[in-house]
Amino acid sequence: MKLGDFLLKVIFWSGMTQAEVAKKCNISTPALNELIKNKRGINVKYAKSFEELFGIPTMIWLMWGNIDELNKEE
């Protein structure tokens, strides 16, 4: 499962809309949508925001993003 797929599931389980998540994380809705579609990589700012909102540690988000990047290189 790619990071974007996981993020979409977490958002669904949270009961929030993508727009609500973007607003609470102080990121644009298009940027969040690009993350979900795996068109944008995660960064520390996003990972910290997701930790604060969802309780999933920053390192998990960053490691998952790194795994996605490594898989692209293969």
Language-model-detected regions and their locations in the chain:
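Residues in the helix-turn-helix
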Residues: 20, 31, 60
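Short, basic-rich loop-to-helix N-cap that marks the start of a DNA-contacting helix
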Residues: 39-52
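Helix-turn-helix DNA-binding elements, focusing on the entry/boundary residues of the two helices
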Residues: 18, 29, 44-47
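Short alpha-helical "recognition helix" segments of helix-turn-helix
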Residues: 20-22, 50
